[in-house]
């Protein structure tokens, strides 16, 4: 096991961070939520449509109800650090998926250091982090697609260990 942990190709890294705000309705609130994500990430957010009609919530199929933005690289790590600071570097083990990704939510975007603007309001958001290792692209590319072995795939235990050492955080077993 010690040989595997010292291999540079085995090191976990953040492939992408997805920030999502689901408003539940189209219109003015959705555009204000998009402004929040644009302030936070510096990128233009994309609007997401409802998959199907839910009459109890007043949602129609194909109605734009959410905005999200995908952030990669050092900017993703910096935004994730701010989000984890809000959560006080504590996540539950349920926040980690079997494939090694994790996510969490915050209640107020102003906790991230964004100045409060009364015309925008306060929005909560979800953070989704996709983890990966070097060389994992061979399973997703179009040309010369291949597979990777089970030992190289990310899993829940590896991600939890990486999370604890990287951010000096704790994972609660609730």
UniProtKB/Swiss-Prot annotation:
NCBIfam families: PRK04219.1. This is Large ribosomal subunit protein uL5. Belongs to the universal ribosomal protein uL5 family. The keyword Ubl conjugation does not apply. It holds the Pfam family Ribosomal_L5_C. GO terms for cellular component: cytosolic large ribosomal subunit. Component of the large ribosomal subunit. Mature ribosomes consist of a small (40S) and a large (60S) subunit. The 40S subunit contains about 32 different proteins and 1 molecule of RNA (18S). The 60S subunit contains 45 different proteins and 3 molecules of RNA (25S, 5.8S and 5S). Gene3D superfamilies: 3.30.1440.10. One of its GO terms (molecular function) is RNA binding. Component of the ribosome, a large ribonucleoprotein complex responsible for the synthesis of proteins in the cell. The small ribosomal subunit (SSU) binds messenger RNAs (mRNAs) and translates the encoded message by selecting cognate aminoacyl-transfer RNA (tRNA) molecules. The large subunit (LSU) contains the ribosomal catalytic site termed the peptidyl transferase center (PTC), which catalyzes the formation of peptide bonds, thereby polymerizing the amino acids delivered by tRNAs into a polypeptide chain. One of its GO terms (biological process) is translation. Keywords: Cytoplasm, Ribonucleoprotein, Ribosomal protein. It comes from the Eukaryota. The keyword Protein biosynthesis does not apply. It is found in: Cytoplasm. InterPro entries: Ribosomal_uL5 (IPR002132), Ribosomal_uL5_C (IPR031309), Ribosomal_uL5_CS (IPR020929), Ribosomal_uL5_dom_sf (IPR022803), Ribosomal_uL5_N (IPR031310). The gene is RPL11.
